[in-house]
Swiss-Prot record:
Subcellular location: Cytoplasm
Enzyme class: oxidoreductase
Site (Transition state stabilizer): 66
Loss of function: phenotype: Neither hmoA single mutant nor the hmoA hmoB double mutant display robust and reproducible phenotypes relative to the wild-type.
Keywords: Cytoplasm, Heme, Iron, Metal-binding, Monooxygenase, Oxidoreductase
Coiled coil (residue ranges): none
Protein source organism: Bacillus subtilis (strain 168)
Protein name: Heme-degrading monooxygenase HmoA
Length: 108
């Protein structure tokens, strides 16, 4: 399994905009090898907010196929030259190979 984590820090009050964008139906769901997309919101009382999007793939090759796909590239070209939203403070993307998974008793 291969995982991409996209951590976005946004100004206070704007996490919902990011959550809405990454929770909406899109073309990625049709991509072969996609396991799931999970959207997480950091529990903060006040101040800047953090949203993490975890995208799980069957393999790194499946992720690479997505990155090179016409649909993915077209999406980036459509946004080329557009300024980033003013509420977006930073974005960090990290890639991981899953080395172990332990199952709990949930849904058993």
């Amino acid at each position: 399994m291969f995982v991409q984590l996209r951590k976005m820090t946004v100004k206070e009050g704007f996490a919902d905009k990011v959550i809405e964008r990454f929770s909406a139906e899109g073309i990625i769901e049709k991509q072969e090898g996609l396991i799931d997309v999970t959207v997480l919101e950091k529990n903060v009382r006040r101040g800047d907010e953090e949203v993490v999007v975890m995208i799980r793939w069957e393999s790194e090759d499946h992720w690479k196929q997505w990155e090179k796909s016409d649909a993915h590239i077209a999406g980036h070209k459509a946004n080329k030259g557009k300024p980033k939203p003013d509420y977006l403070i930073s974005t960090e993307v990290s890639m991981y190979h899953v080395r172990a998974v332990k199952q709990g008793t949930y849904n058993q």
